[in-house]
Amino acid sequence: MELLPHEKQVVEYEKTIAEFKEKNKENSLLSSSEIQKLDKRLDRLKEKIYSDLTPWERVQICRHPSRPRTVNYIEGMCEEFVELCGDRTFRDDPAVVGGFAKIQGQRFMLIGQEKGCDTKSRMHRNFGMLCPEGFRKALRLAKMAEKFGLPIIFLVDTPGAFPGLTAEERGQGWAIATNLFELARLATPIIVIVIGEGCSGGALGMAIGDVVAMLEHSYYSVISPEGCASILWKDPKKNSDAAAMLKMHGEDLKGFAIVDAVIKEPIGGAHHNPAATYRSVQEYVLQEWVKLKDLPVEELLEKRYQKFRTIGLYETSSESDSEA
């Protein structure tokens, strides 16, 4: 597994403890209580390091090559999954994976953005950058879910919509805008979870829902830290400063009422214990579905509308208040 800079101290300590335990089998150098003390010291070290991460270090965790992707969540959460392909207009976009899913006996339409896990699959998936047909595919499946009365799960993980000339020629902006319009009035519950990168319109085109949650180390932003640094300072190396200023992680976005919940990850990130992450996401999905399933359609749509209508509203003091 690829090591991130802040993980090196933890890994070195783990190796040292493993060596002690191996030698201890032969010579009994340490008692069981002393070994337990070493393990507890390791746990404290992990807690200290991972509770004091900078925003940029959390972006690195979010981008870790071993971080679970949509296809991993499908395998880890679903008892059954039937994939559906194509947008019925141009072609199938491999950057979107969607279909009928069964989770704990309940049927959903699960639609997610997929980056790939190795060089070959990343090229095939276009690194998770959707073309217009990807957004149209997602909308087609969402409307199918509405028709059959199925709740929808959107898994968001993209560095942004594909910015190439061919995508623009096929109406990239129009496809994203259409999704925003149509998803806002879709008469079925929609649960959105940002599992990795949630960047710009590429993320937003599949992130209109009744509840929006994020994994602890995922991010949701109008632009990547590198893109922001290039624009503001003409220096992409200032990505660490940009990551802090963008307020792109769950605790900040929950405070701004942009997301509703932050799902805890295992210590070190989802890639350290994927199975535990799948369980946490599954529990959240089922918990929210129970809250949404019995709402009248009119109330569901009104709450969804008000949720997004109020994002970005703020109050300023009047002149009389400031004079007082």
From Swiss-Prot:
Top-level EC class as recorded in UniProt: transferase
Catalysed reactions listed for this entry: N(6)-carboxybiotinyl-L-lysyl-[protein] + acetyl-CoA = N(6)-biotinyl-L-lysyl-[protein] + malonyl-CoA
Family: Belongs to the AccA family.
InterPro entries: Acetyl_CoA_COase_a_su (IPR001095), ClpP/crotonase-like_dom_sf (IPR029045), COA_CT_C (IPR011763)
EC number: 2.1.3.15
Cellular compartment(s): Cytoplasm
Domain CoA carboxyltransferase C-terminal: residue ranges: 37-291
HAMAP family linked to this entry: AcetylCoA_CT_alpha
GO molecular function: acetyl-CoA carboxylase activity; ATP binding; carboxyl- or carbamoyltransferase activity
Subunit structure comment from the entry: Acetyl-CoA carboxylase is a heterohexamer composed of biotin carboxyl carrier protein (AccB), biotin carboxylase (AccC) and two subunits each of ACCase subunit alpha (AccA) and ACCase subunit beta (AccD).
Keyword annotations: ATP-binding, Cytoplasm, Fatty acid biosynthesis, Fatty acid metabolism, Lipid biosynthesis, Lipid metabolism, Nucleotide-binding, Transferase
Transmembrane parts of this sequence: none
Record's protein name: Acetyl-coenzyme A carboxylase carboxyl transferase subunit alpha
Native organism: Chlamydia trachomatis serovar L2 (strain ATCC VR-902B / DSM 19102 / 434/Bu)
Pathway(s) per entry: Lipid metabolism; malonyl-CoA biosynthesis; malonyl-CoA from acetyl-CoA: step 1/1
Task performed by this protein: Component of the acetyl coenzyme A carboxylase (ACC) complex. First, biotin carboxylase catalyzes the carboxylation of biotin on its carrier protein (BCCP) and then the CO(2) group is transferred by the carboxyltransferase to acetyl-CoA to form malonyl-CoA.
Pfam families linked: ACCA (PF03255)
Stored PANTHER family: ACETYL-COENZYME A CARBOXYLASE CARBOXYL TRANSFERASE SUBUNIT ALPHA (PTHR42853), ACETYL-COENZYME A CARBOXYLASE CARBOXYL TRANSFERASE SUBUNIT ALPHA, CHLOROPLASTIC (PTHR42853:SF3)
CC annotations in GO: acetyl-CoA carboxylase complex
BP-aspect Gene Ontology terms: fatty acid biosynthetic process; malonyl-CoA biosynthetic process
UniProt cross-references to SUPFAM superfamilies, sorted A to Z: ClpP/crotonase (SSF52096)
